[in-house]
Amino acid sequence: HDPEAGARCTISYAAVELRTHLLQMEPDAQICFVSQRHNGKAAIELHADSLTASGDAYALLPQKDGLLIRGAGRVGVLYGVYEFLKMQGWRWLEPGTAGEYAPEPGCGLLWPKNAVHDASASTLGRGFSIEGALKESADLLIWMARNRMNAYGDRPNTRALMRKLGIVMRDGGHIFEAILAPDRPTPSGRTLWDAHPEWYGTPAHGPKSRQTALQTQFCVSQPELIPYLCEELLRHIMGPWHEADEIDVWGLDTWGSVCTCERCRALGNGTDQMLHMASHFRSFLDRARAAGRLDHDVKMALIAYEGTSTLAPPERPIPQNLLDAGDYLIYAPIVRCYAHGFDDPGCSYNRAYASALSGWNQIRPHLPVMVLEYYNVSKFEDLPLLFTHSMAHDFQVYRRTGAAGFVYMHVPLVNWGMRALTQVLFAELAWDPDADIAKIKAEFLSRRYGAYAGRLRSVYDQIDMASQQITSWRAWKDRSLLSRLQSWNGGRPERPLQVDDHFQTPEAFDTAGEQMLSLLQAALLTLRETLSAVKHDTAAIRTDIVTAVNPAQQRSAQQSAQLRHALEEDLRLLVYGTDTMQLMLRMGQYYTALYAGCDDRAALLWRQIDTLEQRLEQYYMPLTFSTDCLDLISNDALTRTQLREVIARCRKFRIDQHWEDAVC
């Protein structure tokens, strides 16, 4: 916690990164560290305007005998170094050495002819909102810094590295489920529910109960509850969250149920109730800081999210102490549609989200807003989805509506495959919403696939098109096909398959599903053919079984290994994606066939479902992370479709009916 020592650490690391990369370009170069320039010798000087600030703006300033890389703070120096390396041709497309793409060796340094200045308007941060205590990776964090990202969850094993890289660490989240667990024992020996049933929210319908206590937001108007929560918050901040720079303070994830008691209703809507509580927290934390009970400043990140009934802007002014403290809001459109622009008034999903975000921005004065995107929300289960079609437009909308930061759930720790493009685009757009998406994508494909970039462009375009309706297929809430299937008992349906207004009818769903599947299968075929061509390229295969001895040989071997890695990882991910989406389509079609009494067609579809089930059972799709305990989970692919139990119910129905194809 010594800012000047931290600055020296980060700037020293920047110097080492610069030297390491330059030596890979010019192995015979003599590069040394000095404390001052030597007359007549080319030098790259690293300078921070402030040793006590972590400002990430930077400038590359040509000098008579070299270059000055100047940062507003220590992080700006680091980002300036990476900007200079990008000028040389370096790219970091995914974590680890497999994602490092170097320039041709021996080409000499490219010095900027004119001054380069850059700064991001995303001052709240750019990064990932993560799940799971075990989700940490040094390679990922280094990739983030190299791509100018600076927000991640606090994790103990990589905490020092995050400090060095200038990454802002967050903790907390939906914290009150544990703090207000009804069966939590109190010092008196009674459970929290038995001691304080009045603390739990009054539901709109029916009585309170221990079993349903956490399905309604707690009663923020209870005079004894707020002090209890304040002390719990302080205990966590001074305990397990002590190293975090910011704390996510989010309500119960109840999806739409707020306390309806008279005093809570008098506070305003659900958002007003949240802000009332947060204001008390802020006042308490400020007093604790002044009294020495809290030993460091900490920001609160509140949330605008329909799961906590806080999506809509407040009806009353925002408390001044939240504004004064620099606390901010995370805007979380979890069920947004990717087939339409975020601001498309014709989209039943996005219309409400865009209106609410605009409403937050129109409040004066208002809390700064960070947008939380959902490119890998838990319902998507690491499917090979691409969002290039929507990202450029949406980031422009976010900027116009005042967004000052960007994060997304949940970045995969491994197996990026083609999703590396989403991560690269997200990093570039989070820094600069005006970034040239077409140029970035073209460069990405060229560097990742070399001579095969043209083939892979068609693969990426097909996957992108197939991803557009993913919200209608698999989103949270009961409008998606997945939710409809999960609520089905597996028997003969009593009503037609319900689809959202994007599909409109089961017949339109059927047509759209077959088109989506055709796109994925075509992409899969091209991937297989490309990988086969690479494997049969004998010119790239060495037979002398010796280590490469010169830079050209080393580069050739590295490029060949990187290409194989990229294609093989793409293939594995797309096999899983195609299997999953085909299973979903066939399940929806099977439902419709049963409802229509078309038992022969249902039998044919059931055989296909059975085949897909067996295939998905045979391979793993890692990784997921437990949010409840220290667990790392590698589920089979069938489990990750979230249809295992639905298929089991369907099978039971068929067996009970004594249908001859019940066992295939």
Where are these regions (language model features)?
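Catalytic domains of carbohydrate-active enzymes that cleave complex glycans
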Residues: 402, 428-664
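Acidic, His- and aromatic-enriched active-site or binding-groove loops in soluble protein domains
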Residues: 167-176, 191-198, 267-281, 319-340, ...
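Short, well-ordered secondary-structure micro-motifs within conserved domains or adaptor modules
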Residues: 29-56, 159, 163-165
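Acidic/histidine-rich, surface-exposed loop or edge segments in extracytoplasmic proteins
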Residues: 1-9, 214-215
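Feature activates predominantly on carbohydrate-active enzymes
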Residues: 13-17, 21, 60-246, 250-269, ...
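Structured mid-domain segments that build the active-site/substrate or prosthetic-cofactor binding neighborhood
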Residues: 225, 235, 240, 348-454, ...
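Aromatic-lined carbohydrate-recognition surfaces of secreted/lumenal glycan-active proteins
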Residues: 278-313, 369-376, 408-409
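Substrate-binding cleft/loops of secretory-pathway carbohydrate-active enzymes
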Residues: 301-334, 382-389, 415-422, 580
